[in-house]
């Protein structure tokens, strides 16, 4: 394949037409999907538990997702900006077969005033060729255990032949009650 980035963008455009979803929404989903893939191959994969809307999308194979954020519970890591910055920089530099997706950190925001638990929002820009897609990643702490325990799942992909990321997730029961 001469230009895998161009090919992927073309396929994502076709997928947006097929599903009758705006191309920008598909780019958001794909950017989140690739970030999950990079988390899943990082040394921090066991410190992140996916929860919230992106998890529901991944479980239900919904063809849309209304927000630009994905939510994670962080375990066994301090919730300090300096540590989160180190972790995120490590994750976005992970090698996958889709290294033409590049991420840039745009900023951090404390979210404790908006959430039940302390946390940090990381604002990222995902770049594929000339596209720039804004996504937010919300990290929360405050729960040391989940009942039932988190489960490792293969998450869906937008393009069927792309590698499915595998990550710890909330249980269905925990997602329903959160």
Residue ranges and their predicted role:
Residues 1-178:
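Compositionally biased terminal segments of proteins
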């Amino acid at each position: 394949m001469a230009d895998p980035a161009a090919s992927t963008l073309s396929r994502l455009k076709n997928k947006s037409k097929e599903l009758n979803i705006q191309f920008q929404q598909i780019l958001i989903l794909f950017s989140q999907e690739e970030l999950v893939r990079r988390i899943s191959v990082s040394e921090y994969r066991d410190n992140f538990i996916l929860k919230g809307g992106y998890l529901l999308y991944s479980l239900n194979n919904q063809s849309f997702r209304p927000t630009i954020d994905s939510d994670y519970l962080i375990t066994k890591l301090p919730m300090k900006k300096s540590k989160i910055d180190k972790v995120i920089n490590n994750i976005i530099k992970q090698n996958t077969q889709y290294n033409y997706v590049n991420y840039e950190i745009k900023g951090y925001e404390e979210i404790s005033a908006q959430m039940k638990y302390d946390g940090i929002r990381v604002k990222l820009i995902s770049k594929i060729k000339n596209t720039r897609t804004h996504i937010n990643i919300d990290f929360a702490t405050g729960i040391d255990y989940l009942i039932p325990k988190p489960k490792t799942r293969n998450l869906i992909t937008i393009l069927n032949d792309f590698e499915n990321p595998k990550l710890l997730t909330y249980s269905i029961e925990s997602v329903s009650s959160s």
